[in-house]
């Protein structure tokens, strides 16, 4: 509940945040709208595999997997989401045929539902420790398989999660693998 209130407060001030990020060239002038549920890429009918990683390191770590999946005839499209402009630019260096990039939506209930309704992924794979409560809850409400890949937790993070033990347990049980 507290998280949802906070994320909606951030949404209210997001135009100011986006303006400063555009000024600092940390947002793409035409693509920042993807974070608000305006899609710039077309979904192809068929099986879509979705990977999400925060930034460059996470995206680079999945390139070998994407290269293999590109050759799988059952998979029609591979969607990669991230939060940073630099990770988007890295992906453009590769000449993938089935793989596209979109920015991850703001983690409100509305934006995450809109994202899932449009893309309809067969499976969602979150790389490292990218944890977005509204998105993860909506993924499970849509009966989409959810994988946390290459996850790790530091001692510091573990102590923080332990403060909210029942919430953490409920949350992490949403992952299939």
Region spans (language model):
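Membrane-interacting alpha-helical segments
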Residues: 2-6, 10-17
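Active-site and donor-binding regions of nucleotide-sugar-utilizing enzymes
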Residues: 15-177
């Amino acid at each position: 509940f507290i998280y949802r209130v906070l994320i909606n407060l951030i949404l209210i001030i997001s135009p100011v945040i986006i303006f400063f990020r555009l000024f600092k060239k940390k947002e793409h002038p035409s693509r920042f709208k993807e974070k608000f549920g305006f899609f710039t890429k077309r979904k192809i009918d068929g099986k879509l595999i979705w990977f999400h990683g925060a930034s460059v390191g996470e995206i680079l770590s999945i390139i070998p997997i994407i290269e293999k999946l590109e050759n799988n005839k059952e998979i029609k499209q591979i969607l990669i989401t991230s939060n940073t402009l630099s990770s988007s630019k890295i992906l453009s260096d590769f000449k993938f045929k089935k793989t596209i990039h979109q920015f991850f939506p703001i983690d409100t209930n509305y934006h995450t539902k809109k994202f899932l309704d449009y893309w309809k992924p067969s499976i969602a794979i979150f790389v490292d420790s990218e944890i977005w409560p509204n998105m993860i809850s909506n993924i499970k409400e849509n009966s989409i398989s959810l994988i946390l890949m290459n996850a790790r937790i530091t001692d510091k993070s573990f102590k923080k999660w332990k403060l909210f033990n029942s919430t953490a347990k409920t949350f992490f049980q949403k992952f299939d693998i």
